[in-house]
From Swiss-Prot:
Protein name in UniProt: Small ribosomal subunit protein uS8
Gene3D superfamilies assigned: 3.30.1370.30, 3.30.1490.10
Coiled coil: none
InterPro entries xrefs: Ribosomal_uS8, Ribosomal_uS8_CS, Ribosomal_uS8_sf
Keywords, in A-Z order: Ribonucleoprotein, Ribosomal protein, RNA-binding, rRNA-binding
Family the entry assigns: Belongs to the universal ribosomal protein uS8 family.
Source organism (scientific name): Clostridium botulinum (strain Okra / Type B1)
Subunit annotation: Part of the 30S ribosomal subunit. Contacts proteins S5 and S12.
Role of this protein: One of the primary rRNA binding proteins, it binds directly to 16S rRNA central domain where it helps coordinate assembly of the platform of the 30S subunit.
Amino acid sequence: MVMSDPIADLLTRIRNANVVRHEVVEVPSSNIKKAIANIMLTEGYIRNLEEYRDGSVDMLRITMKYGQNKERIITGLKRISKPGLRVYCRKDETPKVLNGLGVAVVSTSKGIVTDREARKLGVGGEVLCYIW
């Protein structure tokens, strides 16, 4: 099956697992998905990320992170730039999510980075998603 929006699929799988408090989510791997998951790992939204091969398909195993008493660390995930409507920002228009409490994932010429890194590098790009 061909997916029209693999990034939205990744975010939806993580959102659904978060709602029912699953420990592990498995998604088909790609470079963009890996970069977004790595940002989630470094920002502290997920516990672990590993890549493995299932037959002929590369997969990502994402271990979800919860607080004490299983409260959710991820309160929201939102896809911003979609295949039907791309959203771009200039270097001086990089969005802040919840006044800096959340993270905007931006695809730039320097790679896929957070909004803070994009401001530091002085680059703009396509705003992929918000995580808070």
